[in-house]
């Protein structure tokens, strides 16, 4: 297994780009597109708050990052909203104008036959049993296994678990598993979302376990790859420093409720964006950035 471990994502991302580009396990061509690929990768982030990066050549675009986060945590799956911020989604959308990889819709809106969302199931599992091994959220579901699917969901699942360290301090750890991830485009937006999920779960659980601390974030990927069209840009990027960045929630405000539905603040933020009301402001800098970077002319 290829393992990269560090306190901050900026260093992890630098090392991942370096290994995938200069020391790939394979050079292959799925769908006729040449890639350099690492397989069976573990990324171990010790500080889930240090979940982004800055680089002189390329950094995550706030005009995409924050609208996508708003879309996810609102539980939506409509192409109409997200396509304003990236035309990529137009290529993989369903005929009815929905998107399979709308992670928030999969976790916070869709309910199972027992009336529970994926997030609600994970939270309730840990509320019932602090040592539970059942706090899992499924992204890729059986309904996605159909021929001709242009958007076969890349993330398989996420799992939370609470464990004590040797000093008896309890931590909430999170693990995600993916079948495939684009190192150039996908991961820089996926990691902030996953770690915000961990932060939100931590906030909800602290109502029941007040001394609970946030723990590690581990990310397992079967294929981390770089497409040939991005090779030159990766070379350029690796010539500059990677500085730590953070996309974190304010613990005084929830993004979602315990059942996965959007919080009051997030609902008001979405309304502000849809109505182009840029004068709405909250005490949460993250929600304010969602509004600022989502409102378009």
Predicted regions and their residues:
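Terminal, non-catalytic protein-protein interaction segments that mediate quaternary/complex assembly
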Residues: 1-297
């Amino acid at each position: 297994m290829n393992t990269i471990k560090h306190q901050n994502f900026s260093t992890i991302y630098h090392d991942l780009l370096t290994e995938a580009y200069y020391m790939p396990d394979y050079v292959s061509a799925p769908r006729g597109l040449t890639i350099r690929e690492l397989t069976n990768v573990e990324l171990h982030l010790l500080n889930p708050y240090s979940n982004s990066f800055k680089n002189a050549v390329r950094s995550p675009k706030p005009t995409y990052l924050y609208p996508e986060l708003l879309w996810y945590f609102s539980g939506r799956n409509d192409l109409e909203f997200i396509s304003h911020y990236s035309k990529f989604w137009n290529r993989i959308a369903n005929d009815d104008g929905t998107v399979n990889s709308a992670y928030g819709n999969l976790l916070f809106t869709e309910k199972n036959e027992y009336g529970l969302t994926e997030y609600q199931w994970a939270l309730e599992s840990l509320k019932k049993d602090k040592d539970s091994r059942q706090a899992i959220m499924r992204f890729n579901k059986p309904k996605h296994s159909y021929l001709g699917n242009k958007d076969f969901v890349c993330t398989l699942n996420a799992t939370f678990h609470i464990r004590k360290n040797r000093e008896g301090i309890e931590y909430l750890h999170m693990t995600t598993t993916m079948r495939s991830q684009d190192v150039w485009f996908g991961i820089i937006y996926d990691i902030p979302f996953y770690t915000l999920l961990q932060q939100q779960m931590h906030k909800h659980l602290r109502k029941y376990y007040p001394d609970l601390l946030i723990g590690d974030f581990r990310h397992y990927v079967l294929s981390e790859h770089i497409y040939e069209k991005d090779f030159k840009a990766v070379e350029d990027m690796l010539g500059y420093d990677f500085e730590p960045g953070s996309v974190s929630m304010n613990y005084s405000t929830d993004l979602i409720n315990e059942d996965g539905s959007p919080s009051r603040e997030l609902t008001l933020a979405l309304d502000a964006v849809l109505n182009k009301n840029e004068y709405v402001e909250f005490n949460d800098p993250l929600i304010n950035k969602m509004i600022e970077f989502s409102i378009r002319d």
